[in-house]
Amino acid sequence: MAFASVLKDAEITAALDGCKAAGSFDHKKFFKACGLSGKSADEVKKAFAIIDQDKSGYIEEEELKLFLQNFKAGARALSDAETKAFLKAGDSDGDGKIGVDEFAAMIKG
């Protein structure tokens, strides 16, 4: 499953262009730029399922590191600092991973 079913190519490209430089990823700006923050709960769940590569029901640190590559093959991996900041922002219960409800709250936040 690809994001084409949820997001527009132009929005994905704009969002990725905004965080090409190492250390420049900001999840709030990215979710807004790609249009995910304005999507329905069902569409957000679809996005979560795409990012949850191992289908564990959670997005773990390794999946976050490769987050941008879900949107476009060849996109850069997040740095360790970006990955940890992203995880901290979304992991509201402190279990070291992001569940679907935490993901939805982070997108709408």
From Swiss-Prot:
Write out the residues that bind Ca(2+) 2: 91, 93, 95, 97, 102
Q: Name one GO cellular component term.
A: cytoplasm
Note the InterPro entries from the entry.
Answer: EF-hand-dom_pair, EF_Hand_1_Ca_BS, EF_hand_dom, Parvalbumin
- Provide the disulphide bond pattern: none
Cite the EF-hand domain residue spans from the record.
39-74, 78-109
Residue positions annotated to bind Ca(2+) 1 are 52, 54, 56, 58, 60, 63
Q: What Gene3D superfamilies does the annotation carry?
A: EF-hand
Taking the record's annotation, the residue ranges forming a coiled coil are none
List the keywords (alphabetical).
Acetylation, Allergen, Calcium, Metal-binding, Muscle protein, Repeat
Q: Which family does it belong to?
A: Belongs to the parvalbumin family.
Q: What does this protein do?
A: In muscle, parvalbumin is thought to be involved in relaxation after contraction. It binds two calcium ions.
Listed name of the protein: Parvalbumin beta
Native source species: Scomber scombrus (Atlantic mackerel)
Q: What is the lineage of its organism?
A: Eukaryota, Metazoa, Chordata, Craniata, Vertebrata
